Amino acid sequence: YGFALLLGKLGFSRIRSLARGLGSLLWTCLPKRRRLATESIARHLELSQATAESLARASFTHNARSFLESVLVPEFGLSHPLLDVERPDLLERLKRGERPSVITTAHLGAWELLASLLGDVSDHPRLTVVRTYKNKLMDYVTTRLRSSHGADVIGHREAAFPVLRALRKNGYAAFLADHNTSRSEAFFLPFLGEEAAVNKGPAVLAVRAKALVWPIALIRDGDRYRIIIEE
């Protein structure tokens, strides 16, 4: 954990550079993943091989950057100078906590950094629901980083009762809704010509707690970050 904190002190610009290097390394060292990504993009988006390969390579850099941005969670937050808020009025409503709030996002943009924003939203109970890592050290480090702004991190298998308790205190619960999941836990919706599983857990808990649902994404905008909030 201490090494992760030191790595975060490198700052946003150096982490971007590291991500480019790591993405290139992964692209070179993982030929099966490289082919799978390129073929999937070409098939689902109906693109040429060259365009699909370019997008696939960019996705490797994106994933590397998302992974490394986890060490920046302690450095980020709602008052960070690199953050732009698209709808300040909705952010203020969210912060007031007049109703329990279920926040949904996806593996889109700088999703790891959203943990810092949730921690800064309010003093009400705040939970981030995640899938735990099988590697205990990795799980420990990422949990410490994600909770560094005060939000509690909880595994999705044990989440239902803690989430309901938090929501009944006008708290906040954040979910990544695009994880693949079992048929009993999912809605299936059309996506790029196939059926994709969407976890129905956040919707069920929101209904039970009479909570507002807030779709939120943190998008990279050049060297800056832009938070998009819907209600």
Over which residues does each language-model region extend?
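Catalytic core of membrane glycerolipid acyltransferases/transacylases, capturing the structured
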Residues: 98-157, 180-192, 196, 220
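Membrane-anchoring hydrophobic helices of lipid-metabolizing enzymes
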Residues: 1-105, 110, 122, 139-144, ...
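Short amphipathic alpha-helical segments and helix-helix/interface helices
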Residues: 91-92, 115-119, 142-143, 163-164, ...
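Membrane-associated lipid acylation/remodeling enzymes share a hydrophobic transmembrane-juxtamembrane segment
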Residues: 158-221
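Short, electropositive alpha-helical surface patch
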Residues: 226-231
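Short, composition-biased local secondary-structure segments
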Residues: 5-10, 110-116, 165-178
